Amino acid sequence: MHSPSTLPSIPIVTDLAALPGDHLQSVTLCCPSCEGLGGSAYDSLVLLPIHDANERLLSELRKGVLSESQVFAGVFALDPFRRHVDILKALETAGCHRVVNFPSVTAIDGEMRASLEDFGYGVTAEMNLLRTAIAKGFSTLAVVDSFGMAQEAVAIGVSGLIAARHANDAMLAEFSELAHETSLGLFRLPDAVGGT
């Protein structure tokens, strides 16, 4: 079983050019929309409609991606302006073949989360993004916040799981068991962007 303190966190980078050479082989999440969100609420702030998260990602990736690196593109699955297939095609064109559902609705709970789910802007949309990416040959990571979500992610063939920041020890134990069925295992979101 993993506790939050022993589970490896996945670094979040906002600028690929600033990625140190020694990080080329370590699993990293690229999310340019996290730039300037140094506080601990970055995972919910990045969901706000104050920027075009996927355009910022695609713009950063157009600068070049090392194909052998373990950089996973943080794709906002709830993008109201782009279809998943179009985002994935743009990633492919940029030479990126790794995707994670981040920013993610896992940062939201309560009535807001239920409303998003009711309108089709929830976990279902995120799983559809990952499912489509896998079908197109992408390696994927899934940010998860429930056993059911983790179970579905593993069933569709994700390469690894990332525990949402609010995951408790019982959830981490469940995720850890499921992550044994993946090639990359289990990570956690960091406490802050740039933190571990």
Curated annotation (Swiss-Prot):
Keywords: Plasmid. The keyword S-adenosyl-L-methionine does not apply. GO terms for molecular function: catalytic activity. InterPro entries: Aldolase_TIM, Pyrv/PenolPyrv_kinase-like_dom, TIM-br_IGPS-like, Tobamovirus_resist_UPF0261. SUPFAM superfamilies: Phosphoenolpyruvate/pyruvate domain. PANTHER family: UPF0261 DOMAIN PROTEIN (AFU_ORTHOLOGUE AFUA_1G10120). This is Uncharacterized protein y4oT. It comes from Sinorhizobium fredii (strain NBRC 101917 / NGR234). The lineage of its organism: Bacteria, Pseudomonadati, Pseudomonadota, Alphaproteobacteria, Hyphomicrobiales.
